[in-house]
Amino acid sequence: MELNEEVYRQPDIEESGEMKQKVKKLNSLLKKYRSTTVSYLFGEETQVLDSDTISSWLQIKNSGISINKDAAADYISNMANKYNTIYVPRTFHTSLGTDVTVSDNEYGYRIDQDAELTQLLEDLKSGENVSREPVYSSSGMKRNGTDDLAGNYIEVSLDSQHLWLYKDGALVTETDIV
């Protein structure tokens, strides 16, 4: 019995120059993403978005490689929850020796999550290793991790009618107030 060529199923993908080009392009993109890191600077603290995390966001389809924006947005949301300081209660050990918690403060850092997502996607597409601060919608003067006062503040006691000025954690001056 002899069968002709029409009986055999044709392969879905045939080796061709076009296919080789597509595979080469996809491999190049994968290598680019696998070698990319983004280091977020929070004063002396750094949070690194490494290539393993970035790789877990990649979606490979026939048309190419894309980044799962929801996964990237979740990463940014978690980072914002960790490092945002605006409206976060702060506890101080006062000059008079008591602890006081200040709530609803309007000073501090807040990551602009939408703008940060846009910037992060641009960083990833560049394929370069990046070190930078996140995009903020609100920022302070100085920070180290979640400490955005860095020992610089004015303390006022209305009961004692007294003011203390601290710079870099050291008392600079104090005075009575009325």
Predicted regions mapped to residue ranges:
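Surface-exposed, secretory/extracytoplasmic low-complexity segments enriched in Ser/Thr/Asn/Gly/Pro
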Residues: 1-178
